[in-house]
Protein backbone atom coordinates (compact mmCIF):
# COMPACT_ATOMS: atom_id res chain seq x y z
CA UNK A 1 0.00 0.00 0.00
CA UNK A 2 1.38 3.35 -1.03
CA UNK A 3 0.27 6.71 0.24
CA UNK A 4 1.58 10.22 -0.31
CA UNK A 5 0.88 12.52 2.59
CA UNK A 6 1.02 16.18 3.44
CA UNK A 7 0.66 15.67 7.18
CA UNK A 8 2.05 12.93 9.33
CA UNK A 9 2.72 11.41 12.72
CA UNK A 10 5.44 13.85 13.66
CA UNK A 11 6.27 15.59 16.89
CA UNK A 12 7.95 18.88 16.02
CA UNK A 13 10.38 19.67 18.79
CA UNK A 14 11.98 22.88 17.62
CA UNK A 15 12.08 25.26 14.70
CA UNK A 16 14.39 23.92 12.03
CA UNK A 17 16.76 26.71 11.15
CA UNK A 18 20.14 25.67 9.82
CA UNK A 19 23.29 27.30 8.62
CA UNK A 20 23.66 26.42 4.93
CA UNK A 21 26.13 23.59 4.54
CA UNK A 22 26.68 21.87 1.21
CA UNK A 23 26.52 18.11 1.48
CA UNK A 24 30.04 17.14 0.52
CA UNK A 25 30.54 14.71 -2.32
CA UNK A 26 33.11 11.98 -1.94
CA UNK A 27 36.49 12.47 -3.50
CA UNK A 28 36.99 9.71 -6.05
CA UNK A 29 39.51 7.93 -3.87
CA UNK A 30 37.62 8.24 -0.57
CA UNK A 31 34.89 6.17 1.07
CA UNK A 32 33.21 8.62 3.48
CA UNK A 33 30.06 6.70 4.51
CA UNK A 34 28.85 3.14 4.96
CA UNK A 35 27.49 2.96 1.41
CA UNK A 36 30.15 5.41 0.13
CA UNK A 37 27.46 7.90 -0.90
CA UNK A 38 24.41 8.97 1.16
CA UNK A 39 22.20 6.85 -1.14
CA UNK A 40 24.12 3.64 -0.33
CA UNK A 41 25.00 2.69 -3.90
CA UNK A 42 28.17 0.96 -2.68
CA UNK A 43 29.82 1.88 -5.98
CA UNK A 44 33.50 2.74 -6.25
CA UNK A 45 34.52 4.90 -9.25
CA UNK A 46 38.04 3.45 -9.15
CA UNK A 47 39.18 1.48 -12.19
CA UNK A 48 42.68 0.25 -11.39
CA UNK A 49 41.49 -3.28 -10.54
CA UNK A 50 39.80 -4.87 -13.54
CA UNK A 51 38.56 -8.26 -14.75
CA UNK A 52 41.89 -8.63 -16.54
CA UNK A 53 44.13 -8.21 -13.45
CA UNK A 54 41.97 -9.02 -10.42
CA UNK A 55 43.36 -12.56 -10.26
CA UNK A 56 46.68 -11.07 -9.08
CA UNK A 57 45.23 -9.31 -6.01
CA UNK A 58 47.28 -9.93 -2.89
CA UNK A 59 46.86 -9.32 0.81
CA UNK A 60 48.75 -6.19 1.83
CA UNK A 61 47.98 -5.75 5.53
CA UNK A 62 45.68 -6.80 8.37
CA UNK A 63 44.70 -4.87 11.48
CA UNK A 64 43.50 -6.73 14.56
CA UNK A 65 40.62 -4.74 16.06
CA UNK A 66 40.50 -6.94 19.15
CA UNK A 67 36.73 -7.36 18.80
CA UNK A 68 34.96 -10.23 17.07
CA UNK A 69 31.71 -10.56 15.13
CA UNK A 70 32.06 -7.06 13.68
CA UNK A 71 30.05 -6.16 10.57
CA UNK A 72 31.78 -2.84 9.99
CA UNK A 73 32.65 -1.12 6.74
CA UNK A 74 35.54 1.29 7.40
CA UNK A 75 35.62 4.86 6.11
CA UNK A 76 38.48 6.62 4.32
CA UNK A 77 38.43 10.41 4.44
CA UNK A 78 41.27 12.72 3.41
CA UNK A 79 43.93 10.04 3.64
CA UNK A 80 42.87 8.47 6.95
CA UNK A 81 40.93 5.25 7.57
CA UNK A 82 38.43 5.09 10.44
CA UNK A 83 36.86 1.93 11.77
CA UNK A 84 34.46 1.29 14.65
CA UNK A 85 34.87 -2.09 16.31
CA UNK A 86 33.31 -3.04 19.62
CA UNK A 87 34.70 -0.78 22.31
CA UNK A 88 36.92 1.31 20.03
CA UNK A 89 37.15 3.67 17.10
CA UNK A 90 40.50 3.38 15.34
CA UNK A 91 42.19 5.86 13.01
CA UNK A 92 44.61 4.05 10.70
CA UNK A 93 47.08 4.82 7.98
CA UNK A 94 45.10 3.24 5.14
CA UNK A 95 48.06 2.08 3.04
CA UNK A 96 49.65 0.13 5.92
CA UNK A 97 47.05 -0.38 8.65
CA UNK A 98 49.29 1.47 11.12
CA UNK A 99 47.42 2.92 14.12
CA UNK A 100 47.19 6.71 14.43
CA UNK A 101 44.79 7.06 17.35
CA UNK A 102 42.01 5.18 19.08
CA UNK A 103 38.94 6.14 21.05
CA UNK A 104 37.42 3.83 23.68
CA UNK A 105 33.81 3.61 24.84
CA UNK A 106 31.21 1.00 25.69
CA UNK A 107 30.25 -1.47 22.92
CA UNK A 108 29.71 0.88 20.00
CA UNK A 109 27.96 0.24 16.69
CA UNK A 110 29.12 -2.98 15.09
CA UNK A 111 28.47 -1.68 11.57
CA UNK A 112 30.29 1.63 11.34
CA UNK A 113 30.39 5.40 11.68
CA UNK A 114 28.57 8.41 10.26
CA UNK A 115 30.73 11.37 9.21
CA UNK A 116 29.78 15.04 9.43
CA UNK A 117 32.28 17.48 7.85
CA UNK A 118 31.59 20.34 10.26
CA UNK A 119 31.68 24.03 9.40
CA UNK A 120 33.67 27.18 10.13
CA UNK A 121 32.88 27.01 13.87
CA UNK A 122 32.57 23.29 14.54
CA UNK A 123 35.12 20.67 13.58
CA UNK A 124 34.35 17.46 11.71
CA UNK A 125 32.75 14.70 13.76
CA UNK A 126 31.86 11.04 13.74
CA UNK A 127 28.58 9.82 15.17
CA UNK A 128 27.95 6.32 16.43
CA UNK A 129 25.86 4.55 19.03
CA UNK A 130 26.65 2.64 22.19
CA UNK A 131 24.80 -0.37 23.57
CA UNK A 132 23.68 1.62 26.61
CA UNK A 133 21.52 3.82 24.42
CA UNK A 134 23.80 6.82 23.81
CA UNK A 135 24.51 8.70 20.60
CA UNK A 136 28.20 9.61 20.70
CA UNK A 137 30.00 12.42 18.84
CA UNK A 138 33.76 12.08 18.37
CA UNK A 139 36.07 14.82 17.11
CA UNK A 140 37.68 13.52 13.91
CA UNK A 141 40.93 15.42 14.47
CA UNK A 142 41.58 14.48 18.09
CA UNK A 143 39.74 11.21 18.53
CA UNK A 144 38.07 12.55 21.69
CA UNK A 145 34.43 13.16 22.61
CA UNK A 146 33.22 16.28 20.84
CA UNK A 147 32.71 19.23 23.20
CA UNK A 148 29.36 20.97 23.00
CA UNK A 149 27.42 17.92 21.85
CA UNK A 150 24.84 16.77 24.38
CA UNK A 151 26.34 16.07 27.77
CA UNK A 152 30.07 15.47 27.57
CA UNK A 153 29.83 14.49 23.91
CA UNK A 154 26.84 12.15 24.11
CA UNK A 155 23.04 12.17 24.01
CA UNK A 156 20.78 9.71 25.84
CA UNK A 157 18.63 8.19 23.08
CA UNK A 158 16.36 6.44 25.58
CA UNK A 159 15.03 9.54 27.29
CA UNK A 160 12.65 10.69 24.56
CA UNK A 161 11.24 7.25 23.71
CA UNK A 162 10.69 5.89 27.21
CA UNK A 163 7.21 5.06 28.41
CA UNK A 164 6.42 6.38 31.88
CA UNK A 165 10.11 6.52 32.68
CA UNK A 166 10.71 2.95 31.55
CA UNK A 167 14.33 1.88 31.31
CA UNK A 168 14.13 -0.75 28.58
CA UNK A 169 17.00 -1.69 26.32
CA UNK A 170 17.91 0.59 23.44
CA UNK A 171 20.89 0.54 21.09
CA UNK A 172 22.16 1.88 17.78
CA UNK A 173 23.70 -1.10 15.92
CA UNK A 174 23.92 0.75 12.59
CA UNK A 175 25.37 4.22 12.00
CA UNK A 176 22.93 7.14 11.78
CA UNK A 177 22.26 9.07 8.58
CA UNK A 178 23.21 12.71 8.14
CA UNK A 179 21.61 15.44 6.07
CA UNK A 180 23.10 18.93 6.29
CA UNK A 181 23.31 19.53 10.04
CA UNK A 182 20.81 16.87 11.12
CA UNK A 183 21.85 13.50 12.54
CA UNK A 184 19.02 11.00 11.99
CA UNK A 185 18.77 7.93 14.22
CA UNK A 186 16.78 4.73 14.41
CA UNK A 187 17.71 2.03 16.90
CA UNK A 188 16.93 -1.32 18.47
CA UNK A 189 14.32 -1.43 21.22
CA UNK A 190 13.58 -5.11 21.79
CA UNK A 191 11.38 -7.67 20.07
CA UNK A 192 9.35 -9.06 22.95
CA UNK A 193 5.64 -8.69 23.59
CA UNK A 194 4.41 -5.29 24.82
CA UNK A 195 5.23 -4.83 28.49
CA UNK A 196 5.92 -2.10 31.00
CA UNK A 197 9.23 -0.40 30.28
CA UNK A 198 9.32 -0.99 26.53
CA UNK A 199 10.79 1.84 24.47
CA UNK A 200 9.30 3.25 21.28
CA UNK A 201 11.04 2.89 17.91
CA UNK A 202 10.61 6.52 16.82
CA UNK A 203 12.96 7.91 14.16
CA UNK A 204 14.50 11.17 15.35
CA UNK A 205 16.55 14.08 14.06
CA UNK A 206 19.26 15.75 16.18
CA UNK A 207 21.24 18.96 15.80
CA UNK A 208 24.71 17.85 14.69
CA UNK A 209 26.37 20.62 16.72
CA UNK A 210 24.50 20.56 20.03
CA UNK A 211 22.70 17.21 20.18
CA UNK A 212 19.33 18.92 20.64
CA UNK A 213 16.42 16.84 19.37
CA UNK A 214 14.77 18.58 16.41
CA UNK A 215 11.98 16.22 15.46
CA UNK A 216 10.55 12.75 16.03
CA UNK A 217 8.52 10.55 13.70
CA UNK A 218 6.15 8.17 15.46
CA UNK A 219 6.68 4.80 13.81
CA UNK A 220 3.54 3.58 15.60
CA UNK A 221 1.03 6.43 15.17
CA UNK A 222 -0.53 7.96 18.27
CA UNK A 223 -4.33 8.31 18.47
CA UNK A 224 -5.62 10.62 15.74
CA UNK A 225 -2.44 10.52 13.68
CA UNK A 226 -2.53 9.11 10.14
CA UNK A 227 -2.17 5.34 10.27
CA UNK A 228 -3.57 4.98 13.78
CA UNK A 229 -6.65 3.30 12.31
CA UNK A 230 -4.47 0.31 11.39
CA UNK A 231 -4.10 -0.50 15.10
CA UNK A 232 -6.53 -1.20 17.93
CA UNK A 233 -7.14 1.76 20.21
CA UNK A 234 -4.23 2.21 22.60
CA UNK A 235 -2.11 -0.54 21.02
CA UNK A 236 0.82 1.86 20.66
CA UNK A 237 1.42 1.81 24.42
CA UNK A 238 4.54 -0.08 25.50
CA UNK A 239 4.96 -1.25 21.89
CA UNK A 240 8.56 -1.93 20.88
CA UNK A 241 9.77 -3.02 17.48
CA UNK A 242 8.56 -1.00 14.46
CA UNK A 243 12.06 0.45 14.50
CA UNK A 244 14.89 1.32 12.11
CA UNK A 245 17.63 -1.03 13.30
CA UNK A 246 19.29 -1.18 9.88
CA UNK A 247 20.52 1.53 7.55
CA UNK A 248 18.71 4.66 6.40
CA UNK A 249 19.70 6.54 3.25
CA UNK A 250 19.43 10.14 2.07
CA UNK A 251 18.51 11.84 -1.20
CA UNK A 252 20.66 14.94 -0.76
CA UNK A 253 19.12 16.81 -3.70
CA UNK A 254 15.55 16.39 -2.44
CA UNK A 255 16.19 16.44 1.29
CA UNK A 256 14.53 13.08 1.88
CA UNK A 257 15.59 10.28 4.20
CA UNK A 258 14.43 6.74 3.40
CA UNK A 259 13.77 4.55 6.41
CA UNK A 260 13.13 0.77 6.38
CA UNK A 261 11.06 0.01 9.48
CA UNK A 262 11.00 -3.29 11.34
CA UNK A 263 8.26 -5.59 12.53
CA UNK A 264 5.90 -4.66 15.36
CA UNK A 265 6.23 -6.80 18.44
CA UNK A 266 5.63 -9.63 19.10
CA UNK A 267 7.43 -10.92 15.99
CA UNK A 268 5.25 -14.00 15.56
CA UNK A 269 1.99 -13.20 17.35
CA UNK A 270 -0.33 -10.28 16.75
CA UNK A 271 -3.65 -10.93 18.48
CA UNK A 272 -3.21 -7.66 20.39
CA UNK A 273 -2.56 -5.65 17.22
CA UNK A 274 -5.38 -6.41 14.75
CA UNK A 275 -4.87 -4.46 11.53
CA UNK A 276 -2.09 -3.79 9.03
CA UNK A 277 0.02 -2.06 11.71
CA UNK A 278 1.50 1.01 10.02
CA UNK A 279 4.32 1.88 9.80
CA UNK A 280 5.66 -1.55 10.59
CA UNK A 281 7.47 -3.33 7.74
CA UNK A 282 7.29 -0.16 5.67
CA UNK A 283 9.67 1.91 3.62
CA UNK A 284 8.95 5.49 4.62
CA UNK A 285 10.26 8.69 3.04
CA UNK A 286 10.63 11.57 5.50
CA UNK A 287 11.60 15.20 5.09
CA UNK A 288 15.09 15.10 6.56
CA UNK A 289 14.84 18.58 8.10
CA UNK A 290 11.42 18.23 9.74
CA UNK A 291 10.59 14.53 9.95
CA UNK A 292 7.36 15.02 8.01
CA UNK A 293 6.14 11.93 6.18
CA UNK A 294 6.22 12.33 2.40
CA UNK A 295 5.18 8.82 1.37
CA UNK A 296 5.28 5.24 2.50
CA UNK A 297 4.95 1.72 1.14
CA UNK A 298 4.10 -1.11 3.47
CA UNK A 299 5.95 -4.21 2.27
CA UNK A 300 4.38 -6.71 4.70
CA UNK A 301 0.97 -6.29 6.32
CA UNK A 302 0.58 -7.41 9.96
CA UNK A 303 3.89 -9.24 10.06
CA UNK A 304 3.84 -12.67 11.76
CA UNK A 305 7.16 -13.97 10.36
CA UNK A 306 9.82 -11.42 11.38
CA UNK A 307 10.10 -10.35 7.74
CA UNK A 308 11.20 -6.78 8.45
CA UNK A 309 13.15 -4.99 5.71
CA UNK A 310 16.69 -4.90 7.05
CA UNK A 311 18.67 -3.59 4.08
CA UNK A 312 19.57 0.00 3.17
CA UNK A 313 17.20 1.51 0.59
CA UNK A 314 19.53 2.11 -2.36
CA UNK A 315 19.08 5.17 -4.58
CA UNK A 316 19.24 4.35 -8.28
CA UNK A 317 18.21 5.84 -11.63
CA UNK A 318 15.79 3.98 -13.90
CA UNK A 319 15.67 4.80 -17.60
CA UNK A 320 12.18 3.99 -18.77
CA UNK A 321 9.81 5.43 -21.36
CA UNK A 322 12.36 7.93 -22.59
CA UNK A 323 13.01 9.52 -19.21
CA UNK A 324 15.21 9.04 -16.16
CA UNK A 325 13.24 8.21 -13.03
CA UNK A 326 14.92 8.80 -9.66
CA UNK A 327 14.23 5.55 -7.85
CA UNK A 328 14.89 3.63 -4.65
CA UNK A 329 15.47 -0.13 -4.50
CA UNK A 330 14.55 -2.12 -1.38
CA UNK A 331 15.41 -5.81 -1.03
CA UNK A 332 13.47 -7.75 1.62
CA UNK A 333 13.92 -10.92 3.65
CA UNK A 334 11.36 -12.47 1.29
CA UNK A 335 13.83 -12.00 -1.55
CA UNK A 336 11.49 -9.47 -3.15
CA UNK A 337 13.14 -6.45 -4.77
CA UNK A 338 10.79 -3.45 -4.73
CA UNK A 339 11.72 -0.50 -6.96
CA UNK A 340 9.85 2.75 -6.30
CA UNK A 341 9.91 6.26 -7.69
CA UNK A 342 11.74 7.89 -4.82
CA UNK A 343 9.87 11.18 -5.19
CA UNK A 344 6.30 9.85 -5.30
CA UNK A 345 6.61 6.32 -3.90
CA UNK A 346 4.94 4.79 -6.97
CA UNK A 347 6.12 1.28 -7.93
CA UNK A 348 7.97 1.60 -11.22
CA UNK A 349 7.31 -1.93 -12.47
CA UNK A 350 3.94 -2.39 -10.83
CA UNK A 351 2.88 -4.03 -7.58
CA UNK A 352 -0.15 -6.12 -6.69
CA UNK A 353 -1.89 -7.45 -3.60
CA UNK A 354 -2.11 -11.25 -3.77
CA UNK A 355 -4.40 -13.44 -1.64
CA UNK A 356 -2.54 -15.36 1.08
CA UNK A 357 -3.52 -18.12 3.56
CA UNK A 358 -5.30 -17.17 6.77
CA UNK A 359 -4.61 -18.08 10.40
CA UNK A 360 -6.22 -20.75 12.57
CA UNK A 361 -4.81 -19.36 15.84
CA UNK A 362 -7.61 -18.21 18.19
CA UNK A 363 -7.81 -14.43 18.42
CA UNK A 364 -5.18 -13.82 15.74
CA UNK A 365 -5.72 -11.56 12.72
CA UNK A 366 -4.18 -11.88 9.27
CA UNK A 367 -4.24 -9.67 6.23
CA UNK A 368 -6.16 -11.22 3.35
CA UNK A 369 -3.47 -10.07 0.89
CA UNK A 370 0.23 -9.24 0.77
CA UNK A 371 2.12 -6.98 -1.69
CA UNK A 372 4.33 -8.41 -4.45
CA UNK A 373 6.28 -6.51 -7.11
CA UNK A 374 5.38 -7.50 -10.67
CA UNK A 375 9.06 -7.21 -11.61
CA UNK A 376 11.61 -8.43 -10.88
CA UNK A 377 10.44 -11.93 -9.90
CA UNK A 378 11.34 -13.25 -6.43
CA UNK A 379 15.11 -13.55 -6.12
CA UNK A 380 15.09 -16.37 -3.54
CA UNK A 381 13.11 -19.53 -2.91
CA UNK A 382 9.54 -18.94 -1.67
CA UNK A 383 8.17 -22.49 -1.88
CA UNK A 384 9.21 -26.05 -1.08
CA UNK A 385 7.90 -29.19 -2.79
CA UNK A 386 9.02 -32.29 -0.83
CA UNK A 387 8.63 -34.38 -3.99
CA UNK A 388 11.44 -32.56 -5.79
CA UNK A 389 13.10 -29.93 -3.59
CA UNK A 390 14.83 -32.06 -0.94
CA UNK A 391 18.61 -32.08 -0.64
CA UNK A 392 19.94 -35.18 -2.46
CA UNK A 393 23.69 -34.71 -3.01
CA UNK A 394 25.07 -36.98 -0.28
CA UNK A 395 23.20 -39.91 1.31
CA UNK A 396 24.06 -39.10 4.94
CA UNK A 397 22.62 -35.60 4.95
CA UNK A 398 19.71 -36.56 2.68
CA UNK A 399 18.76 -39.32 5.13
CA UNK A 400 19.00 -36.93 8.10
CA UNK A 401 16.66 -34.45 6.40
CA UNK A 402 14.13 -37.09 5.36
CA UNK A 403 14.06 -38.40 8.91
CA UNK A 404 13.50 -34.87 10.25
CA UNK A 405 10.57 -34.46 7.87
CA UNK A 406 8.91 -37.82 8.50
CA UNK A 407 9.52 -38.08 12.24
CA UNK A 408 7.94 -34.68 12.88
CA UNK A 409 5.28 -34.97 10.15
CA UNK A 410 6.38 -31.67 8.65
CA UNK A 411 4.21 -30.00 6.02
CA UNK A 412 5.29 -27.46 3.39
CA UNK A 413 3.56 -24.09 3.47
CA UNK A 414 3.49 -21.29 0.92
CA UNK A 415 4.46 -17.62 1.00
CA UNK A 416 3.01 -15.68 3.93
CA UNK A 417 1.23 -18.73 5.35
CA UNK A 418 0.78 -18.15 9.10
CA UNK A 419 2.30 -20.70 11.44
CA UNK A 420 -0.56 -23.10 12.30
CA UNK A 421 -1.69 -24.24 15.70
CA UNK A 422 -0.12 -27.45 16.94
CA UNK A 423 1.55 -28.77 13.77
CA UNK A 424 4.93 -27.91 12.31
CA UNK A 425 5.31 -26.46 8.84
CA UNK A 426 8.29 -25.51 6.70
CA UNK A 427 8.22 -21.97 5.32
CA UNK A 428 10.57 -20.19 2.90
CA UNK A 429 12.47 -18.06 3.51
CA UNK A 430 13.62 -18.05 7.12
CA UNK A 431 14.06 -14.94 9.24
CA UNK A 432 17.58 -14.66 7.79
CA UNK A 433 16.32 -14.17 4.24
CA UNK A 434 16.15 -13.95 1.28
CA UNK A 435 17.93 -10.65 1.26
CA UNK A 436 19.70 -9.50 4.42
CA UNK A 437 20.95 -6.32 6.07
CA UNK A 438 23.86 -6.01 3.61
CA UNK A 439 21.45 -4.90 0.90
CA UNK A 440 22.44 -4.35 -2.73
CA UNK A 441 25.24 -2.66 -4.62
CA UNK A 442 24.61 -0.69 -7.80
CA UNK A 443 26.65 -0.04 -10.92
CA UNK A 444 25.07 3.02 -12.59
CA UNK A 445 27.20 2.54 -15.71
CA UNK A 446 25.70 -0.92 -16.33
CA UNK A 447 22.28 -0.17 -14.76
CA UNK A 448 22.64 -3.31 -12.64
CA UNK A 449 22.00 -3.94 -8.96
CA UNK A 450 23.70 -6.91 -7.33
CA UNK A 451 21.92 -8.86 -4.59
CA UNK A 452 23.15 -11.77 -2.49
CA UNK A 453 20.35 -14.03 -1.25
CA UNK A 454 20.05 -17.15 0.89
CA UNK A 455 17.70 -20.06 0.26
CA UNK A 456 16.98 -21.32 3.76
CA UNK A 457 13.65 -22.31 5.24
CA UNK A 458 12.32 -22.23 8.78
CA UNK A 459 10.16 -24.62 10.78
CA UNK A 460 7.50 -23.60 13.22
CA UNK A 461 4.15 -23.98 14.90
CA UNK A 462 2.07 -21.91 17.28
CA UNK A 463 1.30 -23.24 20.74
CA UNK A 464 -0.68 -21.92 23.71
CA UNK A 465 0.98 -20.24 26.67
CA UNK A 466 -0.93 -19.70 29.89
CA UNK A 467 -0.03 -16.90 32.28
CA UNK A 468 0.21 -18.61 35.70
CA UNK A 469 -0.92 -15.45 37.49
CA UNK A 470 -3.92 -14.47 35.38
CA UNK A 471 -4.79 -17.64 33.52
CA UNK A 472 -4.82 -15.69 30.25
CA UNK A 473 -3.92 -17.73 27.18
CA UNK A 474 -1.76 -16.30 24.42
CA UNK A 475 0.24 -18.05 21.70
CA UNK A 476 3.88 -18.22 20.77
CA UNK A 477 6.03 -19.78 18.08
CA UNK A 478 8.04 -22.93 18.69
CA UNK A 479 9.68 -25.53 16.47
CA UNK A 480 10.75 -29.17 16.43
CA UNK A 481 14.33 -28.10 17.14
CA UNK A 482 13.24 -25.82 19.97
CA UNK A 483 12.67 -22.08 19.93
CA UNK A 484 11.04 -19.66 17.54
CA UNK A 485 13.84 -19.61 14.98
CA UNK A 486 13.99 -23.29 13.98
CA UNK A 487 15.88 -23.41 10.70
CA UNK A 488 15.35 -26.10 8.08
CA UNK A 489 18.85 -27.54 8.32
CA UNK A 490 20.98 -29.94 10.32
CA UNK A 491 22.04 -27.74 13.26
CA UNK A 492 25.30 -29.67 13.65
CA UNK A 493 26.49 -29.09 10.07
CA UNK A 494 24.32 -26.07 9.19
CA UNK A 495 23.70 -27.55 5.75
CA UNK A 496 20.12 -26.85 4.58
CA UNK A 497 17.66 -29.64 3.93
CA UNK A 498 16.51 -28.06 0.67
CA UNK A 499 18.24 -28.58 -2.66
CA UNK A 500 21.00 -26.13 -3.58
CA UNK A 501 21.88 -23.46 -4.43
CA UNK A 502 21.94 -22.39 -0.79
CA UNK A 503 23.21 -18.93 -1.67
CA UNK A 504 23.21 -16.91 -4.89
CA UNK A 505 24.45 -13.64 -6.33
CA UNK A 506 21.84 -12.09 -8.61
CA UNK A 507 22.13 -9.14 -11.02
CA UNK A 508 18.97 -7.21 -11.91
CA UNK A 509 18.68 -4.74 -14.79
CA UNK A 510 17.01 -1.73 -13.18
CA UNK A 511 15.82 -0.34 -16.52
CA UNK A 512 13.76 -3.44 -17.35
CA UNK A 513 13.24 -5.22 -14.03
CA UNK A 514 14.65 -8.40 -15.57
CA UNK A 515 17.23 -10.70 -14.03
CA UNK A 516 20.45 -10.23 -16.00
CA UNK A 517 22.27 -13.19 -14.47
CA UNK A 518 22.39 -15.31 -11.33
CA UNK A 519 25.15 -17.60 -10.08
CA UNK A 520 25.73 -19.79 -7.02
CA UNK A 521 27.60 -17.82 -4.36
CA UNK A 522 29.99 -19.75 -2.13
CA UNK A 523 30.78 -23.39 -1.46
CA UNK A 524 30.34 -25.99 1.26
CA UNK A 525 33.87 -27.32 1.67
CA UNK A 526 33.00 -30.92 2.50
CA UNK A 527 30.62 -31.08 -0.46
CA UNK A 528 33.13 -29.41 -2.79
CA UNK A 529 35.66 -32.09 -1.78
CA UNK A 530 33.21 -34.67 -3.13
CA UNK A 531 32.82 -32.84 -6.42
CA UNK A 532 29.77 -30.68 -5.63
CA UNK A 533 31.19 -27.21 -6.24
CA UNK A 534 28.11 -25.24 -7.32
CA UNK A 535 26.04 -25.52 -4.15
CA UNK A 536 26.45 -21.94 -3.04
CA UNK A 537 26.62 -21.09 0.66
CA UNK A 538 24.29 -19.27 3.01
CA UNK A 539 25.02 -15.54 2.97
CA UNK A 540 24.83 -12.60 5.34
CA UNK A 541 26.62 -9.39 4.42
CA UNK A 542 26.91 -7.11 1.40
CA UNK A 543 28.71 -6.43 -1.86
CA UNK A 544 30.53 -3.58 -3.61
CA UNK A 545 30.44 -2.71 -7.32
CA UNK A 546 33.28 -0.89 -9.06
CA UNK A 547 33.75 1.15 -12.22
CA UNK A 548 36.46 -1.36 -13.07
CA UNK A 549 33.68 -3.82 -13.92
CA UNK A 550 33.77 -5.97 -10.79
CA UNK A 551 31.58 -7.01 -7.88
CA UNK A 552 33.39 -7.82 -4.62
CA UNK A 553 31.65 -9.79 -1.91
CA UNK A 554 32.42 -11.80 1.22
CA UNK A 555 29.16 -12.56 3.06
CA UNK A 556 29.32 -16.35 2.60
CA UNK A 557 29.50 -18.96 5.35
CA UNK A 558 32.72 -20.38 3.86
CA UNK A 559 35.37 -17.85 4.94
CA UNK A 560 35.91 -16.64 1.37
CA UNK A 561 36.16 -13.24 -0.32
CA UNK A 562 35.39 -13.12 -4.05
CA UNK A 563 35.36 -10.93 -7.14
CA UNK A 564 32.92 -11.43 -10.01
CA UNK A 565 32.74 -9.90 -13.46
CA UNK A 566 29.84 -7.45 -13.25
CA UNK A 567 28.58 -8.04 -16.79
CA UNK A 568 28.47 -11.84 -16.68
CA UNK A 569 28.64 -13.07 -13.09
CA UNK A 570 31.80 -15.07 -13.77
CA UNK A 571 33.88 -15.66 -10.64
CA UNK A 572 37.35 -14.25 -11.31
CA UNK A 573 39.11 -14.30 -7.93
CA UNK A 574 38.67 -15.91 -4.53
CA UNK A 575 40.75 -15.89 -1.37
CA UNK A 576 40.34 -17.44 2.06
CA UNK A 577 39.90 -15.11 5.03
CA UNK A 578 40.62 -15.50 8.74
CA UNK A 579 36.88 -15.86 9.42
CA UNK A 580 33.59 -15.31 7.61
CA UNK A 581 33.01 -11.74 6.40
CA UNK A 582 29.55 -10.72 7.61
CA UNK A 583 30.25 -7.22 6.36
CA UNK A 584 30.33 -5.24 3.13
CA UNK A 585 33.66 -4.36 1.48
CA UNK A 586 34.94 -0.93 0.46
CA UNK A 587 37.65 0.47 -1.79
CA UNK A 588 39.88 3.55 -1.71
CA UNK A 589 42.82 5.08 -3.54
CA UNK A 590 45.93 5.28 -1.39
CA UNK A 591 48.39 8.13 -1.40
CA UNK A 592 50.79 5.66 -3.00
CA UNK A 593 48.54 5.55 -6.08
CA UNK A 594 47.26 2.01 -5.45
CA UNK A 595 43.62 0.98 -5.29
CA UNK A 596 42.86 -1.01 -2.14
CA UNK A 597 39.92 -3.26 -1.34
CA UNK A 598 39.15 -3.82 2.35
CA UNK A 599 36.88 -6.29 4.16
CA UNK A 600 36.19 -7.02 7.84
CA UNK A 601 36.53 -10.74 8.61
CA UNK A 602 34.48 -10.72 11.79
CA UNK A 603 32.57 -13.99 11.52
CA UNK A 604 30.46 -14.89 14.50
CA UNK A 605 27.08 -14.92 12.78
CA UNK A 606 24.13 -17.30 12.85
CA UNK A 607 25.17 -19.00 9.61
CA UNK A 608 28.88 -19.52 10.33
CA UNK A 609 30.02 -23.11 9.97
CA UNK A 610 33.81 -22.77 9.73
CA UNK A 611 36.47 -22.59 12.45
CA UNK A 612 37.27 -20.18 13.94
CA UNK A 613 33.66 -19.04 14.06
CA UNK A 614 34.66 -15.45 14.84
CA UNK A 615 37.53 -13.20 13.86
CA UNK A 616 38.77 -9.68 14.53
CA UNK A 617 40.90 -8.73 11.53
CA UNK A 618 40.33 -5.93 9.05
CA UNK A 619 42.09 -7.06 5.85
CA UNK A 620 43.31 -5.04 2.85
CA UNK A 621 44.09 -6.24 -0.68
CA UNK A 622 45.77 -4.56 -3.66
CA UNK A 623 47.49 -5.39 -6.92
CA UNK A 624 51.21 -6.20 -6.60
CA UNK A 625 53.51 -3.21 -6.33
CA UNK A 626 55.34 -2.36 -9.51
What kind of feature is each model-predicted range?
Residues 312-361, 566, 600, 612, ...:
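Phosphate/diphosphate-binding loops
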Residues 31-35, 67-86, 108-134, 168-195, ...:
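Repeat-blade elements of multi-bladed beta-propeller folds
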Residues 40, 44-119, 126-151, 155-158, ...:
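N-terminal cofactor/phosphate-binding cores enriched in small/glycine residues
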Amino acid sequence: MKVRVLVCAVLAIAATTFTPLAQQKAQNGDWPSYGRDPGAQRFSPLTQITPQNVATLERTWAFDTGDTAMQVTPLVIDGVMYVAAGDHIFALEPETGKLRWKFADQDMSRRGLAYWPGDAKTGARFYTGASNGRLIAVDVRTGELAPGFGTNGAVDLKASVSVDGGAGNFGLPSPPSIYRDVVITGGTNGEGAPATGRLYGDVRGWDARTGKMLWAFHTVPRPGEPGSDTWPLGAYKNRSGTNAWGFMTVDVERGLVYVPLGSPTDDFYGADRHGNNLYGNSLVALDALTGKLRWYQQLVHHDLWDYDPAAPPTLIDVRRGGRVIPAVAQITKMGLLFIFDRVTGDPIFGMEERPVPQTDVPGEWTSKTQPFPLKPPPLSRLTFDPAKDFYALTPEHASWCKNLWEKNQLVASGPYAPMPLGRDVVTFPSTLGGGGFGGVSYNPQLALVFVNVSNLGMMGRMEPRTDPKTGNVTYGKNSVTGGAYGRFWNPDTRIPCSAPPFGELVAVDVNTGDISWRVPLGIVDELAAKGFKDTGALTLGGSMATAGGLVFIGATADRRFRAFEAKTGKELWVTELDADAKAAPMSFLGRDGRQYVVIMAGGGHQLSRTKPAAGSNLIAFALPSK
